[in-house]
Design a protein with these regions (language model features):
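Beta-rich carbohydrate-recognition and catalytic domains
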Residues: 15-40, 47-105, 114-172, 180-234, ...
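Conserved beta-strand position repeated once per blade in WD40 beta-propeller domains
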Residues: 43-45, 109-111, 176-178, 234-236, ...
Length: 396
C-alpha cells in the first residue's frame, strides 16, 4: 500500500473451518496484528476501493480504553486480501478537539463506503463527548460527522451532516449503519433520532445527495418507533432483488426487521423469528446484512445454551439465510460465523465481546466479518476477521 509501512498479519487460522452448505463453502477466522501489541482495536469496519492497480480493502478503526471510551479514528488498508496490512494512521479530522477545560469532543462508530460516482471514500460516524478519563454523562446533543478520502488518498476536514428537525434535538445519527447506493449516486441512509426529554429513539431512512465533498439530506421517510428502553437503534439497510430490508437493534430482548419497496416507506416492524415462528432472544446488539447475489443473510448474536452468562450474549456471532417472503431466519442454515473465545460458564467477563462488527464483500469469492474484540474485564482483545468463502461467485 503506497505511503505506508507494510505489516504481516496473523500466522495460522484461529478458527475451525466449517464445510459447505447453503452457498457457504467454509468459514475461517483469523487474528490480525496491527500496530502496537498493547493496542486493542474497536469498531473495525471495511470497504473495498477500486484502483488502477487493482482493488484494495480500506478499514477504519480506533483504540478502546474503557466503556464507550475510544481513541482517534484511524485507517489501514490491504491490497492482497488481508495477507498484509498498512500501518494504522490517524484520520486527522476525526480526532479529538477540546470543548472546554473538562470536555473533549471526538468521533466514533465510523463506517467507510466507496462512492463510485465521485471515486471517493465516505466515512460517516457521529460525535461523542469525553471527560479526561471516560465517557461524558449526560451527553450533549449528537449528530453525524463525516470525512471524505479523495481519489488521491487525502482525507478532508470533518463536516457535520445537518438536519434541522426538532425530532433530532437530542440526537440524530447513522452510527454503525449499513447504507445503500442509488443509481443516481444518491445514498439511502438509515437514521435513529430522538428529541430532548424522550428516552426512546425512532428510526427513518433518508435520501441523501453527495457531490464528493458534501452530504445533504433531501427527504426523510416516515418514522418507525418502539416504546421500550432507548427504542430502535443502529439500523442497517440492504437492497436485494429490487426490495429494501432494514434490521434494527432494540432493547426488549428482540431484534426487528422490516421491508420496503422504495427504501423510505417501511412496513410495520416485526421481531426476528425462526422460520417456524419462534422469536430469537437478542439483547440490545446490532445486526448486519451479509450480502451475496444468490441470497440475503444476517449476521447476529442471540441467546444460546453456551452464552447465557455472557454480557448481552455478544458471542458467538451467527449467520443465517433470510427467508425473504416470511422475513424470518432459516433455522437449518444457521452456523457460527465467529466462535466464542473464553470460558463462558466460569469466567463470562473474560469472554471476548463480538457485538460491534461489520461485513464487506472483499472479492467475488469471499466476504469478511470484521470485529474489534475485547473482554469486559480488561478491555483487551484481538482484531478478528472471519472469511466467508462462497461456493459460487458473488456477482455483487
Amino acid at each position: 500500500v503506497a505511503g505506508a509501512a507494510v505489516l504481516r498479519t496473523t500466522g495460522g487460522r484461529a478458527g475451525t473451518a466449517q464445510l459447505g452448505r447453503d452457498g457457504i463453502a467454509r468459514i475461517e477466522s483469523e487474528i490480525v496484528k496491527l500496530g502496537s501489541p498493547q493496542t486493542t482495536w474497536f469498531s473495525a469496519r471495511a470497504c473495498t476501493v477500486p484502483g488502477p492497480s487493482g482493488q484494495s480493502v480500506l478499514m477504519t478503526l480506533q483504540s478502546i480504553h474503557g466503556s464507550d471510551f475510544f481513541g482517534p479514528v484511524q485507517w489501514t488498508a490491504t491490497a492482497d486480501l488481508g495477507r498484509t496490512w498498512s500501518e494504522p494512521r490517524p484520520i486527522p479530522s476525526l480526532g479529538r478537539r477540546r470543548v472546554d477545560a473538562e470536555i473533549e469532543e471526538g468521533v466514533c462508530d465510523v463506517v467507510p463506503e466507496y462512492h463510485a460516482a465521485t471515486k471517493t471514500v465516505l466515512a460517516i460516524g457521529h460525535n461523542v463527548f469525553y471527560r479526561p478519563k471516560g465517557f461524558y454523562r449526560p451527553q450533549p446533543p449528537r449528530w453525524p460527522v463525516y470525512a471524505v478520502r479523495s481519489p488521491e488518498g487525502v482525507w478532508s476536514e470533518a463536516r457535520r451532516l445537518p438536519w434541522d428537525d426538532p425530532r433530532g434535538s437530542n440526537i440524530y445519527t447513522c452510527n454503525c449503519a449499513q447504507r445503500s447506493m442509488l443509481d443516481n449516486g444518491h445514498l439511502l441512509i438509515p437514521f435513529s433520532f430522538g428529541p430532548q426529554g424522550r428516552a426512546d429513539r425512532s428510526v427513518a431512512t433518508a435520501e441523501v445527495s453527495f457531490d464528493g465533498r458534501e452530504l445533504k439530506i433531501l427527504r426523510m421517510g416516515p418514522e418507525l418507533r418502539l416504546n421500550a428502553g432507548r427504542g430502535l437503534l443502529e439500523p442497517s439497510l440492504a437492497r436485494f432483488d429490487g426490495r429494501y430490508f432494514l434490521t434494527l437493534r432494540a432493547e426488549d430482548d428482540r431484534g426487528y426487521v422490516t421491508t420496503s419497496d422504495d427504501g423510505l416507506r417501511w412496513a410495520p416492524i416485526r421481531p426476528w423469528c425462526w422460520d417456524d415462528g419462534e422469536p430469537l432472544a437478542m439483547s440490545t446488539t446490532q445486526q448486519r446484512w451479509l450480502m451475496h447475489s444468490d441470497a440475503l443473510r444476517l449476521v447476529y448474536t442471540r441467546k444460546s445454551a453456551e452464552n447465557a452468562k455472557v454480557f448481552r450474549w455478544r458471542a458467538p456471532l451467527y449467520v443465517a439465510e433470510v427467508d425473504r417472503r416470511q422475513l424470518r431466519l432459516i433455522r437449518s442454515s444457521e452456523r457460527v460465523a465467529m466462535a466464542l473465545a473464553g470460558d463462558a460458564e466460569r469466567h463470562p467477563k473474560d469472554v471476548e465481546q463480538l457485538g460491534n462488527f461489520h461485513t464487506v464483500a472483499a472479492d467475488p469469492g469471499q466476504s469478511w466479518i470484521t470485529v474489534g474484540a475485547f473482554a469486559p474485564s480488561t478491555f483487551k482483545g484481538p482484531l478478528r476477521i472471519s472469511r466467508v468463502f462462497w461456493t459460487r461467485p458473488n456477482r455483487g
